[in-house]
Structures are given as structure tokens and as C-alpha cells.
Amino acid sequence: MKHIMVTGPMGAGKSTFMRSLPKPQGNFVIPDNVPDMMLDYSCELKGMMFYEIDAPTATGKVWINWIKTANIQLIIGNGIRKPDENFIELWNYLVKNTPNIKRLIVLNRTDKITKEWETYSSEKIFCVGMGETIDEETAVASENDILTIVDYLEEYYE
């Protein structure tokens, strides 16, 4: 089973990304050798286990095994802004503590990579545009953009 950790600063769009994953979704299976923790959101999709951890939580010592369990880390950033100190701190923490784990950047709320994000050009970067607003606090991302990422992950593991 492949584990995909979705993380990023507060407000970057992690929950929107997770909520936008296609249906049907299966039940998340807790990996071996990690503490049983309450995850913000988790699911199985096409043989991949997705789980969401907020950036402040991800950098806590209690969560280090969850971070190391991931086969891929999807780091969500607010694409309409430049990388902020929270994104940079999280990025540096992940690079230092999990140097051999593949990382993908998902820029939320945009359809283009701006100059400020080019620092990370050695990593695969995806853009995810806005889908629809459900209410003032809830939205879903562009279905086509999310499917592109899921397809990439599936092909990566074939």
C-alpha cells in the first residue's frame, strides 16, 4: 500500500484538496509502526492511502513516524501568494528529516506557477484551480486538476 501525506500551512487548501479527491473512496488503513493518531482527513483511493496533517502538527516530534511512512509528500501551497515563512519552514523540515521521500508541490487556487515558486523547480509542481464554492467556508478544487494529480500518482506507482 502506498501512503500519500498531504500537508501544508494552515489555510493553504489541504482540506479542499482532500475533499476534492474523486469518489468512491475506501477506508484508510493505519500503517504499521506509527502511533494511532487522529487524522484531519484520510481515505483510500485507487490503492493509495491519503492522509492530511497540518504543518504545525507535522513538525511535531510525535508525528515524525507518520511523516517517514509516506511514500510521497504532497505539500500544498497557496499559489496566489509567494511561499510564506510557514511553507518554507515546513519544506525545510521535510527535506531535512525525510531526504529520500519524493515530494510534490500542489499550488492551490491558481493555474500558473509564478516566479516566486520557481525556487522549487527541481520538484514536480502542479497547479489546482478553483472548482466551486459550497458555502462561505467550504469549496472544492477543479476536478480536472485533481484528476491530473491522481493520475500522475497512479502512473508513478505502476
Outline where the language-model segments fall.
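Conserved G1/Walker A P-loop phosphate-binding module
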Residues: 1-34, 45-48
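Conserved catalytic network of the ASCE P-loop NTPase/AAA+ motor domain
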Residues: 42-46, 65-70, 95-99
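Switch II (G3) loop of P-loop NTPases
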Residues: 45-63
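Conserved Switch II/interswitch segment of TRAFAC-class P-loop GTPases
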Residues: 69-89, 110-114
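Conserved beta-strand/loop subsegment of P-loop NTPase cores
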Residues: 72-76, 98-111, 123-129
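Amphipathic helical hotspot of TIR/SEFIR-family domains
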Residues: 82-107
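Canonical P-loop GTPase G-domain recognition
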Residues: 113-158
